[in-house]
């Protein structure tokens, strides 16, 4: 089922799986919520909607990634998701990137499709609102025009993609189901989501 809209510019997918998962105590990308490592589960979901899908990781993680999946290594050490997004835009800079963190176990195709359907190409990004009304940077469509702003933040040592979104012209929408944006960073949050999935 390919749901790409060919009247729009190309859309690639990026799974953010290069974090160190310090608070969780184990790699969030390899947690299995649905019988498959989460980084692969998200990549397979994105393949329905995107031209190409890549997994973002640190250089030392590359060999552990299944060879059936394409990889983009982080160009910048210790810069978090912002560095990964810049690395993706450097890799292919003439298309938009749908960037999704690997720690959103309740995310589903309906939510992704809704974001894509509401995409606005004349802003730097289309994103969901968090509970407190802020942009959610880790399930966002970043347009090519975002690159200079992200690079500027990187050069200034400001590694928060959310703050880039807060200062820029973006489209922000409400998720059909806010639970799909629930991210899991700690063992306690993991237990909470496991209870929801039962």
Segments predicted by a language model, with ranges:
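Nucleotide and nucleotide-moiety/phosphate-recognizing core
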Residues: 2-158, 163-180, 187-197
């Amino acid at each position: 089922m390919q749901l790409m809209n060919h009247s729009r510019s190309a859309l690639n997918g990026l799974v953010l799986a290069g974090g160190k998962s310090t608070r969780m105590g184990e790699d969030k990308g390899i947690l299995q919520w649905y019988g498959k490592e989460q980084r692969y589960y998200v990549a397979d979901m994105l393949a329905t909607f995107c031209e190409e899908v890549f997994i973002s990781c640190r250089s030392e993680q590359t060999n552990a990634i299944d060879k059936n999946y394409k990889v983009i290594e982080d160009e910048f050490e210790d810069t978090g998701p912002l560095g990964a997004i810049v690395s993706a835009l450097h890799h292919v800079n003439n298309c938009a990137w749908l960037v999704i963190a690997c720690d959103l176990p309740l995310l589903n195709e309906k939510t992704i499709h809704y974001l894509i359907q509401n995409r606005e190409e004349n802003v730097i990004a289309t994103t969901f609102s968090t509970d407190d009304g802020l942009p959610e940077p880790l399930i966002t469509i970043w347009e090519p025009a975002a690159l200079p702003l992200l690079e500027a933040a990187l050069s200034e040592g400001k590694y928060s993609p959310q703050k880039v979104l807060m200062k820029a012209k973006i489209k922000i929408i409400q998720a059909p189901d806010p639970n799909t944006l629930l991210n899991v960073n700690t063992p306690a949050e993991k237990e909470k989501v496991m209870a929801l999935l039962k």
